Curated annotation (Swiss-Prot):
Family: Belongs to the Casparian strip membrane proteins (CASP) family.
Source species of the chain: Triphysaria pusilla
Gene Ontology cellular component terms for the protein in this record: plasma membrane
Protein name: Casparian strip membrane protein 2
Organism taxonomic ancestry: Eukaryota, Viridiplantae, Streptophyta, Embryophyta, Tracheophyta
InterPro entries: CASP/CASPL, CASP_dom, CASPL
Parts of the chain that traverse the membrane: 47-67, 97-117, 130-150, 185-205
Length: 208
């Protein structure tokens, strides 16, 4: 009888209980969630890093526009006993507003850098991104308005207006016109980057 029991092998199948199945399902689900979560955070962190780089570029453009326009001054080498031919940015209110607006935008961009770093550390912080969107939009209005007003004056300086007897001055004040034209271009670049920052933050919040 012992030999028969040794020859035959019996397999005992222990059915898996419902609690064990439930635990294994929970473990698999938690593993999938843990695998997906870093991906979403990594994507948002990448967007935040790109946001930080764009802010530095916008800051450089706004500072260049402010410094270039604020230091623009040219005096012609010839003068009379009563007149000296000079052109300065503060002779025109549009250029003065240009310097003030781009200076404010530069200061804001400097202050926004720590908040941009905070979104890199905490990529799921939607409140910070919403705050940046609001102020970025205000700075877009400032820089775009200043650049547009200055561009109108630069156009008149280059081409004049025969109907109002406004003569083009860029043939005489060549250096002055080149500097103010470069400042206007830099301001438009800053405005475009700020617009892109608003769109980028809005997309990140929408996919939050």
């Amino acid at each position: 009888m012992d030999s028969k029991s040794g020859r035959s092998e019996s397999a005992i199948n222990i059915p898996e209980s419902n609690s064990t199945k439930h635990k294994s399902t929970v473990v698999h689900t938690a593993t999938k969630v843990a695998a997906v979560a870093p991906r979403g955070g990594g994507w948002r962190r990448g967007v935040s890093i790109f946001d930080f780089i764009l802010r530095i570029c916008a800051l450089a453009a706004a500072l260049a526009a402010t410094a270039t326009m604020g230091t623009t001054d040219q005096t012609l080498p010839f003068f009379t006993q009563f007149f000296q031919f000079q052109a300065s940015y503060d002779d025109l209110p549009a250029f003065t507003f240009f310097v003030v607006a781009n200076g404010i935008a530069s200061g804001y961009l400097v202050l926004s850098l720590p908040f941009s770093i905070a979104t890199i550390v905490r990529p799921h912080a939607a409140a910070i991104k919403l705050l940046l969107i609001i102020f970025d939009t205000v700075m877009v209005a400032f820089t775009a308005a200043a650049a547009a007003a200055a561009a109108a004056i630069v156009y008149l300086a280059h081409n004049g207006n025969s109907k109002t007897n406004w003569f083009a001055i860029c043939q005489q004040f060549n250096d002055f016109c080149q500097r103010v034209s470069g400042a206007v271009v830099a301001s438009f670049v800053a405005a475009v980057i700020l617009i892109f920052l608003v769109v980028l933050s809005a997309v990140a919040i929408r996919k939050h």
